[in-house]
Amino acid sequence: MAQSPIAEVICEPSPRMTQRLKRQQGATLASTGLRSPDEVLELWLDPRDNWTMVIAYASGTSCIVAMGAHWSSMQPQDPA
């Protein structure tokens, strides 16, 4: 059975989470999307193509919900 790279969800105040991702991992915020009126999904990428998915809550807390490696961005395809 595959094991998760994170044993549990890690939550911190949003400013501290941002600082952790930038300073410890060298990550930059690559994309965001609204998940609900109170939740924003953030995708962070580091220089080695590792990725971290974070949910930022309106309450001021952010939680790492997934991590992985070998991120690859795709260009939208023309449907025609």
Q: What does each model-identified segment do?
A:
Residues 1-80:
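Polybasic/polar functional segments that serve as interface/processing modules
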